[in-house]
Amino acid sequence: MTVIGIDDTDSRNRGMCTTYLATRIATAIEHAGGTVERRLLIRLNPAVEHKTRGNAAIALHTDIDPTDAVEISTQFIDSLAISDDPNTSPGVVITDTCTPHSVADSVIDFCWDAIREFHTIADTVDLIEQVGYHHQGWDGGRGRIGALAAVGAWAALTEWTIEHIAYRQFNRCGTDRDVDEKSVFEAAKRQYPAVWDTVDREEDDAVCVPNAPGPILYGIRGDDVAAVKTVAAEIDSEPVERSSTFITNQGTDIHLRPGTIGSLRDNRAYRVTGTVITDPETRPGGHVFVTLGKRETTEEDHIEETSSKESAVLTDTHHLRTKSSNPDITDQNVSSTITCVAFEPTKRFRQWVRKLRVGDIITVCGEVSNGTLKLEKFAIRSLTRTTKTAPICPGCNRTMKSAGRNQGYRCRDCGTSSSTQSEKSLDRVLSLKWYEVPPCARRHIAQPLIRGDFDAPIMPER
């Protein structure tokens, strides 16, 4: 079988989409008498600096002759890839020396590092040539990094979801999309939760319809092929020129790794448990910040930190071997605290962050950037139920005042003194559950709570 990996053919500002280009290649393969058994959409490390938009690479598994695969792929990249954007650097990797299940261990490890770490183009080319794959790059060919990762993905990963993408007539790119949102909401409601992140009901937003320029009309995500296709069929819209169904690692949390405060590194994503040590603070722009401190870890903490999908991933020996391919990219944050932030675009998620209190123990998930963890979801492990307050005078029922540093409290009316504070019960809205950002703010690779397999009750957003 021939495997074609493609990446970095689009542009943040000028449109195109690697999934569209791959779909055109797949159609050409079929017209040439070949078949495409599988189409993979692989989301890579979302913190990578050199990315176009969603940092996705594509792999096509086909029975076409590799020589024909090279000719067809290069033809479409030459004609459709964005060539006038200095940040676009297409690449293709093609192999027929193995099946998608039996790529070299070094390529499997490479895929894991591309999802959680970083690669250089020099190291990538060295590995491609070691394993004997065909490769070609345009404008530096940085896309060969994602292309090689996509080639290794089927052997590396075990959890998959589905995305069915509908494409517009190509001459309509750059114009407003004509999609009847009422039909989107109704179709999404009927197939939820097998289909998720189609709409954001609270924000009244059809999140499956992109705003960026390019050929995608809408993308329907879920866990069931029939369900996502049913939703797509029930959407009223402008003409759909073509469509493609991808198997993908979207919505799986595969980018997260267990971490501990004091050993987190920038531009990686973690699942880490800590104690809230500051009250939440809303800063200009509506962003909400809260700081976590270290706590003594126990075996139970380890179980918590490997919750969600990590327990399944730990069974993969290739994942256990994964390490940074370039450890000098960024320094480790050795601070005993980590600042977490819920940015304004996370909307109603911020209400939960604002309800945290000093002493709460939580597990947070997100990417670390400039020493700050950008919250994607969090779980309450323990809640502070009381707070310390100045004592009430037993004689006159008034609140005592401080008598001075380390001198306790004194009632200014009757002179009664006390050396200790009182405890006041807190009425907590939060409970021992997982909380998440809404669909309108969810990054492609992050797992919606509704997909399940979490270690505590969930508060899914829809």
UniProtKB/Swiss-Prot annotation:
The keyword tRNA processing applies. It catalyses: cytidine(34) in tRNA(Ile2) + agmatine + ATP + H2O = 2-agmatinylcytidine(34) in tRNA(Ile2) + AMP + 2 phosphate + 2 H(+). GO terms for biological process: tRNA wobble cytosine modification. It is found in: Cytoplasm. It comes from the Archaea. GO terms for molecular function: ATP binding; ligase activity, forming carbon-nitrogen bonds. Keywords: ATP-binding, Cytoplasm, Ligase, Nucleotide-binding, tRNA processing. The keyword Chloroplast does not apply. It is an enzyme of class 6 (ligase). Pfam families: TiaS_FLD, TiaS_TCKD, Zn_ribbon_TiaS. One of its GO terms (cellular component) is cytoplasm. Its EC number is 6.3.4.22. Belongs to the TiaS family. ATP-dependent agmatine transferase that catalyzes the formation of 2-agmatinylcytidine (agm2C) at the wobble position (C34) of tRNA(Ile2), converting the codon specificity from AUG to AUA. HAMAP family: tRNA_Ile2_agm2C_synt. This is tRNA(Ile2) 2-agmatinylcytidine synthetase TiaS. It comes from Haloquadratum walsbyi (strain DSM 16790 / HBSQ001).
